[in-house]
UniProtKB/Swiss-Prot annotation:
Protein name: tRNA-cytidine(32) 2-sulfurtransferase
Keyword Nucleotide-binding: yes
Molecular function terms, GO-annotated: 4 iron, 4 sulfur cluster binding; ATP binding; magnesium ion binding; sulfurtransferase activity; tRNA binding
Known pathway: tRNA modification
Cofactor: Mg(2+); [4Fe-4S] cluster
Gene that produces this protein: ttcA
Key word Disulfide bond present: no
One Pfam entry name: ATP_bind_3
CDD domains per UniProt: TtcA-like
Subunit text: Homodimer.
Principal localisation: cytoplasm
Amino acid sequence: MQTNFSQPQTFNPADITRNVIDNNQDDMVDSLDSDEEDLDLDLDLELSDEQEIAHKGVKSARFKKLQKKLRKQVSHAIRDFNMIEDGDVVMVCVSGGKDSYTLLDILLFLKRIAPINFDVVAVNLDQKQPGYPEEVLPNYLQQQGIPHYILEKDTYSVVKSVVPEGKTYCSACSRLRRGSLYGFAKQIGATKIALGHHRDDILATFFLNLFHGGSLKAMPPKLLSDDKQNVLIRPLAYVEEKDIIKYARYKEFPIIPCNLCGSQENLQRAMINDMLRQWDDAHPQRLASIFKAMQNVAPSQLADRELFDFESLTLQRDDSKRDFEGHNIQVGVANELAEIGLPTQPDIKPFESATAAKKIPTINPIID
């Protein structure tokens, strides 16, 4: 799967989103009543022909607005973290869930219009879970004309034999799946492995490690594997799960359930996901603020000695004189102060001089 290139080009989100949706459609959607925002797509309403046409028009306009939003978020994530470069072969790991379908769909669109050349190939690992509908993904990918590989490997039996009864299979299953996909990416020459984790997955992992792992870490948007053989990317890093749910409904992806093995989601992660949903309902900007904080880390304000050299901190005072501004300084046990060389009558500056400018002094030696 080779591609010829001329000169290197950058991935510009403006090129991605330009002319994707008609401005008139945007205006129409913006004027819709907010109560209709989560209209169920499967409602069976008794509508007249005119109402049916209008209803379909509203849904179409709303979908185009959502589609534009997701494409823009993905293209910005790709640009911000240099996820995809000219000549890359991107292996999209497709599980049959809403996230990986959405990721694949958007990357295929970006491939067609991006100012750089890259290839996309879908890969699914059939782990032989009982009841797994083996024909669903191959049929979908074939119908869409998407180049793909379906890998068959009975990791389910391995997981079942090593995980104690009553424990969740998810962690062991994920590790085995990851190892198989990493190796296959190298085998076919894929230069990037694209995973479908979204913003809420990243936040949940952050709190899982914070509450139960004693560490400040999450899922990075881009990661070099421990063996340095693969680069993982998460182009949905800026996308909210609730938008993916809506997008998948609109697109009517053939979703394959993720709990065919009967294993339940990790209880700790499930509780954190519930917490995040409650926060989002009560405080719509809270999750966005937390994610922004993950991009704005100040190592000197934390306590990790590996990230910041606290031991080497030294004073760097100049010779300028700074007097206390106030009304009085009471001195106690002056003889002890004198013995250690500290002033017994410190100079004082009238507080009025500080208030004359009608502003609060902003000097903060701790933060500065």
